[in-house]
From Swiss-Prot:
GO BP annotation list: 'de novo' UMP biosynthetic process; pyrimidine nucleobase biosynthetic process
Gene Ontology terms for molecular function: magnesium ion binding; orotate phosphoribosyltransferase activity
PANTHER family in alphabetical order: OROTATE PHOSPHORIBOSYLTRANSFERASE, URIDINE 5'-MONOPHOSPHATE SYNTHASE
Pathway entry: Pyrimidine metabolism; UMP biosynthesis via de novo pathway; UMP from orotate: step 1/2
Family matches, as InterPro entries: OPRT, Or_phspho_trans_dom, PRibTrfase_dom, PRTase-like
Descriptive protein name: Orotate phosphoribosyltransferase
Positions bound to orotate: T117, R145
Annotated organism of origin: Natronomonas pharaonis (strain ATCC 35678 / DSM 2160 / CIP 103997 / JCM 8858 / NBRC 14720 / NCIMB 2260 / Gabara)
Family, per entry: Belongs to the purine/pyrimidine phosphoribosyltransferase family. PyrE subfamily.
Domain of life from the UniProt record: Archaea
Entry EC number(s): 2.4.2.10
Gene: pyrE
UniProt keyword list: Glycosyltransferase, Magnesium, Pyrimidine biosynthesis, Transferase
Residues reported to bind 5-phospho-alpha-D-ribose 1-diphosphate: R87, K88, K91, E113, D114, I115, A116, T117, T118, G119, Q120, S121
Length: 173
């Protein structure tokens, strides 16, 4: 069931834009969900953190750098839980870490993400966490664009949950 308050907040913040847009995976779309709008709007961010907090349970939180860091940080404050940040690749300086923050081997981790299109960035984050010893079987996104992410994640034994779907967000438009 759609979170109508969140849908209204995303629309009111003008996080959904219409036109011709190139997406990160190379495809194009007639609409764009601008994560930077909803991640920098305190009202949207609060609603997202509340909704994530209702779903994460006792799992350690993880966010994919850079896009999901505000989301995981706000959720961590809401749940009073520590979190980790997963980089796209290992740093070439300092500690050289790909994962920042601590977790125990075998610990259950849930990945929070902004928008899922193909799901590849979430898959990459889950694989990095699994290689580091975490138990990860779930990704929660703000918006599922319904363009194959759910199926792609399922191929990696990862369940995709979304706060809203593109169908929800674009209904009545």
């Amino acid at each position: 069931m759609a979170n109508q308050e969140l849908i209204d907040a995303l629309r009111d913040a003008e996080a959904v834009k219409f036109g011709e847009f190139e997406l990160s995976h190379g495809g194009t779309s007639e609409y764009y969900v601008d994560k930077y709008v909803f991640e920098t709007d305190p009202g949207c961010l609060r609603q997202i953190a509340d909704a994530f907090a209702d779903r994460v349970g006792d799992a350690k939180l993880a966010g994919v750098a850079l896009g999901a860091v505000p989301l995981v940080a706000a959720t961590a404050v809401e749940t009073d839980s520590p979190y980790v940040i997963v980089r796209k690749q290992k740093k070439e300086y300092g500690t050289g870490n790909q994962i920042e923050g601590d977790f125990d081997a075998g610990e259950e981790v849930v990945v929070l993400e902004d928008i899922a299109t193909t799901g590849q960035s979430a898959i990459d984050a889950v694989e990095a966490l699994r290689e580091a010893g975490a138990t990860v079987d779930r990704v929660i996104v703000v918006v599922d664009r319904e363009e194959g992410a759910r199926e792609n994640l399922a191929e990696h034994d990862i369940e995709l949950e979304s706060l809203v779907t593109a169908s929800d967000l674009l209904a009545d438009r």
